[in-house]
């Protein structure tokens, strides 16, 4: 009978100090959707004015416009009349869709996410975009209570999660 030995190999390198945020910022590009909406971080320089500008710094949250689903949500959302509408943003992440809903004229936006980091980051993005009509909170749809009906429901999250929450 053979005996197996487990071998652990450790290696140590010294890495020069560098500003990792600066390195990340170099590779983080702004996004333009349909030549109508600029999605950028605060550190990006504005080179052209667009009808809608969203300042989104993602930190640890999902929703920058770089992912195809977010890009498509923003593109589709710009085709919907939001004026004086009540909007729900389920699984809001960075609050990118909430901010756009506000800028498109929504009367009130209810945004929520199960992740506390996302809600914290989303709150920062809501504030930097001066969106005062967004109510933002942590929790699942089944745990939160909303009064009245919504005209628009936005949900850039997994289909199975949605089905689990609404059935």
Residue ranges of predicted features:
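Short glycine-rich anion-binding loops that position phosphate/pyrophosphate groups of nucleotides
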Residues: 44, 158-160
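Conserved SAM/SAH cofactor-binding pocket of Class I
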Residues: 60, 64-142
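A short, conserved alpha-helix within the catalytic core of class I
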Residues: 161-167
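N-terminal auxiliary segments of SAM/dcSAM-dependent transferases
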Residues: 1-48
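A short acidic, Gly/Pro-enriched loop at the edge of an enzyme's catalytic core
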Residues: 143-152
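Amphipathic alpha-helical repeat scaffolds
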Residues: 125, 155-157
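Short alpha-helical
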Residues: 19, 116-117, 160-161
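A short, charged helix-loop
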Residues: 52-58
């Amino acid at each position: 009978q053979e005996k197996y030995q487990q071998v652990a190999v450790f290696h140590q390198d010294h890495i020069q100090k560098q500003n990792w945020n600066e390195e990340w910022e170099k590779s983080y590009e702004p996004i333009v959707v349909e030549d109508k909406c600029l999605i950028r971080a605060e550190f990006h320089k504005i080179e052209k004015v667009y009808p809608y500008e969203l300042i989104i710094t993602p930190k640890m949250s999902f929703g920058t416009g770089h992912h195809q689903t977010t890009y498509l949500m923003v593109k589709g959302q710009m085709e919907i009349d939001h004026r004086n509408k009540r909007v729900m943003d389920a699984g809001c992440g960075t609050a990118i869709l909430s901010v756009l809903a506000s800028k498109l004229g929504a009367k009130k936006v209810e945004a929520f996410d199960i992740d506390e980091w996302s809600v914290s980051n989303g709150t920062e993005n809501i504030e930097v975009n001066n969106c005062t009509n967004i109510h933002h909170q942590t929790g699942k749809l089944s745990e939160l209570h909303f009064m009245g009906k919504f005209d628009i429901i936005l949900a850039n999250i997994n289909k199975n999660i949605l089905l689990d929450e609404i059935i």
